Amino acid sequence: QRFTNYKRYDEFFATSIIVKNNKFAGLTAIDLVNGEFVLFIGKALIIATGGAGRLYRFTTYSHSVTGDGLAMAFRAGLPLKDMEFIQFHPTGLVPSGILITEGARGEGGYLRNRFGERFMERYAPKMMELAPRDIVSRSIMTEIEEGRGFEGPEGLDYVHLDLTHLGKEKINERLPMIRELAIKFAGADPV
């Protein structure tokens, strides 16, 4: 531990923020190891609980990102800001939601619609697949909403991230885990 002026509590699930006279007074939590309910008294609180990405049906977020920290802050009367913004990672395996690293696009992967078009040409002709996440995410949604996506399971339509043109050697050297994930969880070999 680099700093000694705090104590770290792993395997605790915070449940409530205690506010007294409009000031932070403490926090309640459950010790996940033994199930005990614990009260922490304090003078200050930093909330770093992640977002709420798991609220969406298809997401690359981990199972723990359910908005509990945001809800806890809201219940305590703390102001929340910019709640309409949720950062999405634009590429994941359908239907599992396993994240496919942006490195796959960085190494030269193409986003293609069901007609085989590299549709990023319409939205970010200079940056193409290397455009920022928000642009890539909106572009994918536009393609799907306008009927150019692939029909997926349970109405979960999608586009393709095509790596085949990179060749086996480059994929095995630069993206071996992506190949392994695609084979194991999507039944597709990108080479």
Regions inferred by a protein language model and the residue ranges of each:
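Flavin (primarily FAD) binding-site architecture
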Residues: 47-60
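Extended, hydrophobic alpha-helical segments in both membrane/secreted and soluble proteins
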Residues: 42-45, 65-72
